[in-house]
């Protein structure tokens, strides 16, 4: 592909300073960002006669022009390169998509503090413990905390509305401070111990509880001593189960495995010598990218992502050494204004943690490769069955979900040659049709999906319709209209269930000819079709249930005179849900902010009929 770029003329204008370069294609999109200690030397390497790397050949063939920015040092170049990669997301760079904030356990500064899951800006006053690698780790920790420390986990509105202990008190998971079942001093003591435990100071917590147990026994408060004994035993069991090192402090341990174009960075989050949790990251890696670039790009993007609230330790242990390690250390230290070290040659506990991280990374890549090969095999077989001239790169599937015509939702799921591509999934809330009219729902969904499609848009090679011939005809009609002026259009295939509706008995129908065929129930190609069909159904029904619940909550309360969105929200938040509102007495309803005794009576009468 010729882009008209004159490399010799350009290189004559480039200096030998440190800096960053941005490569653009003919459309003006940034396709690659790089940095160099010597820009002239680095950029000249792209235009040698013999380029051995296929990735570099493809990149150079698309260059239309190059912008260069000089920097004072290589450290500055590293930081600017990272900023540009985050800004432009170039297709030939290694990209880490880590846009979710990290979850924490939150301990509030209330008179009776609560423990809660928290993700996002830390605006509320209190203490934040973490970050945890994922939401599951936080929920697991909160569940454990309930068993160890009887501290409330309910929100403040629910706490204020209690007139008697809730189920958590009966299960010995909360001491019910809301109704005075525990003194402030006793509750504060449990909060203090929970805080120490979350900081990793298990031994100190156990020591304090042992002292309290002995003191209670001396005072012949045997019931209280028994509670402390049970708490100590539970804590010791937990401590035995957790892998702890006494001298490692806070650090991230990263095992890296890179094979067949798949890179996995498995992180162990070590805090106070304890594994807080782990998480695998899979950056997008262009073909034939060398390991040095993968390592450098990941570490920069991971530790310099200001959009993510992440506590960064002073020490990182990683399984691979690379040439620019010390420059990267300096760049991160400068950007964060704190000491930051990366180690690769470690012993004792650090070596043990590193082996664990590396094993997990290796296993993760092997699993992904196995899955990738399985999916690839299914794609190839489907291409053979459909007698296609070109490989399938993108498939989509539509499904409709509703309950007796209520809250209709259409789903569109996307598969590429690696399987589900969830970032491309879409839902469509269907409006303005006769309830239960699946044909009209399908027509609206397909129309909205391809409303402004053009040749440069994301056109599926195969478009599956989960339904019979009627829905398929509607979809084919819309596709014919939308693609009339384009050279390419998707092949439509209907997936109709058999009379018994059992998996393996599906009939497949071509949209253009309406001819039908079936596949053997053990066919890998059929398994691929079933996978995308089932995923479309799951995504549609989840969206429908969420919409239906929201609609029912809204319509039930807002049909009552005087109840608008604000009062509805206050009622649901204060009492905990629609069923709790329906079961509340007039007095309980009147405790909700903004609800008078007269309004409470009106709500009570309306909901009780």
Swiss-Prot record:
Residues 203-238 form the UVR domain. Keywords: Cytoplasm, DNA damage, DNA excision, DNA repair, Excision nuclease, SOS response. GO terms for cellular component: cytoplasm; excinuclease repair complex. It is found in: Cytoplasm. It holds the Pfam family HHH_5. PROSITE patterns: GIY_YIG, UVR, UVRC. Its main location: cytoplasm. One of its GO terms (biological process) is SOS response. One of its GO terms (molecular function) is DNA binding. SUPFAM superfamilies: C-terminal UvrC-binding domain of UvrB (SSF46600), GIY-YIG endonuclease (SSF82771), RuvA domain 2-like (SSF47781). Residues 16-94 form the GIY-YIG domain. InterPro entries: GIY-YIG_endonuc, GIY-YIG_endonuc_sf, GIY-YIG_UvrC_Cho, Hlx-hairpin-Hlx_DNA-bd_motif, RuvA_2-like, UVR_dom, UVR_dom_sf, UvrABC_protein_C. SMART domains: GIYc (SM00465), HhH1 (SM00278). Interacts with UvrB in an incision complex. HAMAP family: UvrC. The UvrABC repair system catalyzes the recognition and processing of DNA lesions. UvrC both incises the 5' and 3' sides of the lesion. The N-terminal half is responsible for the 3' incision and the C-terminal half is responsible for the 5' incision. Belongs to the UvrC family. This is UvrABC system protein C. It comes from Shewanella sp. (strain MR-4). The gene is uvrC.
């Amino acid at each position: 592909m010729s882009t008209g770029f004159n490399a010799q003329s350009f290189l004559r204008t480039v200096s030998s300073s440190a800096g960053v370069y941005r490569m653009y294609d003919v459309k003006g999109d940034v396709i690659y960002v790089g940095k160099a200690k010597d820009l002239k030397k680095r950029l000249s390497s792209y235009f040698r006669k013999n380029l051995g790397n296929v990735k570099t050949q493809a990149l150079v063939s698309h260059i239309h022009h190059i912008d260069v920015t000089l920097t004072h040092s290589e450290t500055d170049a590293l930081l600017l390169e990272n900023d540009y990669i985050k800004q432009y997301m170039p297709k030939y760079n290694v990209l880490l998509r880590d846009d979710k904030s990290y979850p924490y356990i939150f301990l509030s500064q209330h008179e009776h503090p609560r423990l809660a899951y928290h993700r996002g800006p830390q605006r509320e006053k209190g203490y934040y413990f973490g970050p945890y690698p994922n939401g599951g780790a936080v929920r697991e920790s909160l569940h454990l905390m309930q068993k160890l420390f009887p501290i409330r986990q309910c929100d403040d509105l629910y706490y204020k509305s209690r007139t008697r202990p809730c189920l958590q008190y009966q299960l010995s998971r909360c001491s019910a401070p809301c109704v005075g079942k525990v003194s402030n001093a006793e509750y504060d003591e449990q909060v203090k111990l929970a805080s120490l435990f979350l900081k990793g100071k298990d031994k100190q917590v156990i020591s304090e509880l042992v002292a309290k147990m002995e003191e209670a026994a001396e005072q012949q408060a045997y019931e209280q001593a028994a509670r402390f004994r049970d708490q100590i035993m539970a804590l010791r069991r937990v401590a035995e189960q957790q892998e702890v090192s006494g001298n490692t402090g806070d650090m991230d341990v990263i095992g890296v495995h890179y094979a067949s174009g798949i890179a996995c960075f498995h992180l162990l989050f070590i805090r106070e010598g304890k594994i807080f949790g782990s998480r695998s990251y899979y950056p997008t890696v262009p073909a034939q990218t060398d390991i040095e670039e993968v390592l450098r790009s990941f570490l920069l993007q991971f530790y310099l992502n200001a959009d993510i609230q992440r506590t960064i330790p002073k020490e990182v242990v990683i399984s691979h050494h690379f040439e620019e390690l010390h420059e990267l250390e300096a760049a991160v230290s400068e950007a964060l204004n704190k000491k930051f070290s990366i180690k690769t040659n470690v012993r004792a506990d650090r070596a043990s943690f590193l082996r664990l991280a590396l094993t997990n990374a290796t296993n993760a890549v092997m699993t992904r490769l196995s899955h990738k090969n399985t999916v690839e095999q299914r794609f190839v077989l489907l291409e053979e069955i459909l007698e296609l001239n070109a490989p399938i790169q993108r498939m989509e599937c539509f499904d409709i979900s509703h309950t007796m015509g209520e809250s209709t939702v259409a789903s569109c799921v996307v598969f590429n040659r690696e399987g589900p591509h969830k970032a491309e999934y879409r839902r469509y809330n269907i409006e303005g049709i006769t309830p239960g009219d699946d044909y009209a729902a399908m027509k609206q969904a397909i129309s909205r999906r391809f409303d402004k499609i053009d040749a440069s848009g994301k056109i599926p090679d195969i478009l599956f319709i989960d339904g019979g011939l009627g829905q398929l005809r509607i979809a084919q009609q819309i596709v014919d209209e939308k693609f009339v002026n384009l050279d390419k259009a998707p092949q439509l295939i209907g997936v109709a269930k058999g009379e018994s509706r059992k998996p393996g008995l599906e009939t497949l129908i071509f949209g253009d000819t309406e001819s039908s065929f079936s596949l053997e129930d053990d066919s890998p190609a059929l398994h691929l079709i079933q996978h995308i069909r089932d995923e479309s159904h799951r995504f549609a029904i989840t969206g429908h249930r969420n919409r239906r619940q929201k609609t029912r909550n809204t319509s039930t309360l807002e049909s009552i005179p005087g109840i608008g969105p604000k009062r509805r929200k206050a009622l649901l938040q204060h009492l905990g849900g629609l069923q709790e509102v329906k079961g509340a007495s007039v007095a309980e309803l009147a405790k909700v902010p903004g609800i008078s005794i007269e309004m409470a009576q009106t709500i009570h009468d309306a909901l009780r009929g």
